[in-house]
């Protein structure tokens, strides 16, 4: 058996994926590992690049964009490692991070109590950034969706708003969940950018989520099983946050699926009445600026997805 299976989801992030793969192969030593890339129907030359420059990579060519969790699961289906390391395509390893995770778990005196490991992530300037947070409560989720509605309402006359500014503006609403002063130790959830787990059913994502909340949902299950989610010092990993979202409008595909996923998470894990949350999201979608974009995506389909999400449990 191999020690670790590294699973990377790629969707039209050719340059980022190249740099990520390059760092994995250059930095990973003294461990038996494989790299699996699950591609979600990329059209930017990613597949050709991987075949040419990284022939040892196990490449899964999905016919369409399956979403983050489903694509990772396709990698999990063929993984042969004792451990799984989910790694975002917009990350770069600066040291032998995979071996550090492996050694930490293997040498732990209470390894049977560990559910997942993650590192303290760095930005491109070497500063620590969001690496995890508290498992969100219903109030946290509702607060965040109200923040989105507030921004959209204020933005209806501006026509354009980009991801970076949105995240800055909403940071106060997320403060209860995002942990700024990241330290080694137990945490509610580890970001899905670098998630190290045993290769078993605990590593499988719920495919009801297309985008966002997948890792939070997975780690909520670990929480229910009294398995620890730990951030550890040692691994040095750069996360180029939102580099692959450059220029996205916040009412685009990703934000809408974040809203839908918030309903799934609330209904499934928190067992809460989602009526108020549904109303906030639907009110957001009725704003002229938002509605204009949603109509282009397929409003009827999105409303249907939202209603189905409310029934997931």
Language model regions located:
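Active-site-adjacent helix/loop segment of glycosyltransferases
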Residues: 7, 122, 216-307
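Short, acidic, metal-binding catalytic loop of nucleotide-sugar glycosyltransferases
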Residues: 22-32
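A conserved acidic beta->alpha catalytic loop
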Residues: 23, 39-48, 64, 94
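Glycine-rich, basic loop-to-helix element that forms the pyrophosphate-binding segment
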Residues: 61-79
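Short aromatic/hydrophobic "clamp" motif used to bind/position activated sugar donors
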Residues: 84
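Conserved donor NDP-sugar-binding/catalytic core segment of glycosyltransferases
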Residues: 96-134
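A recurrent flexible, glycine/aromatic-enriched loop bordering the glycosyltransferase active site
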Residues: 152-168, 172-197, 246
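A short, conserved alpha-helix in the catalytic core of glycosyltransferases
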Residues: 179-236
């Amino acid at each position: 058996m191999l020690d670790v299976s590294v699973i990377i989801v790629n969707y039209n992030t050719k340059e980022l994926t190249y740099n990520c793969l390059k760092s994995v192969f250059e930095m990973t030593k003294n461990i038996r590992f494989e790299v699996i890339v699950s591609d979600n129907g990329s059209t930017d030359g990613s597949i050709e690049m991987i075949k040419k420059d990284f022939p040892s990579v196990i490449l899964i060519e999905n016919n369409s964009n399956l979403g983050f969790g489903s694509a990772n699961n396709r990698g999990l289906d063929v993984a042969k490692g004792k451990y799984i390391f989910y790694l975002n395509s917009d990350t770069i390893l600066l040291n032998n991070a995979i071996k550090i995770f492996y050694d930490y778990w293997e040498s732990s005196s209470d390894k049977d109590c560990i559910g997942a490991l993650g590192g303290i992530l760095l930005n491109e300037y070497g500063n620590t950034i969001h690496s995890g947070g508290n498992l969100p409560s219903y109030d946290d989720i509702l607060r965040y969706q109200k923040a989105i509605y507030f921004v959209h309402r204020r933005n209806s006359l501006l026509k354009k708003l980009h991801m970076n500014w949105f995240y800055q503006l909403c940071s106060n609403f997320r403060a209860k969940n995002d942990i700024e002063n990241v330290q080694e130790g137990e945490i509610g959830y580890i970001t899905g950018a670098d998630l190290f787990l045993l290769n078993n059913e605990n590593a499988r994502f719920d495919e009801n989520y297309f985008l966002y909340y997948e890792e939070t949902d997975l780690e909520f299950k670990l929480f229910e099983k009294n398995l620890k989610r730990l951030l550890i010092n040692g691994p040095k990993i750069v996360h180029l946050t939102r580099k692959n979202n450059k220029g996205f409008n916040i009412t685009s595909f990703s934000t809408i699926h974040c809203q839908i996923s918030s309903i799934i998470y609330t209904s499934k894990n928190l067992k809460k009445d989602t009526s108020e949350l549904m109303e906030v999201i639907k009110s957001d979608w009725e704003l002229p600026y938002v509605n204009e974009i949603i109509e282009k995506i397929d409003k009827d389909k999105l409303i249907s997805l939202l209603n189905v999400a409310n029934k997931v449990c």
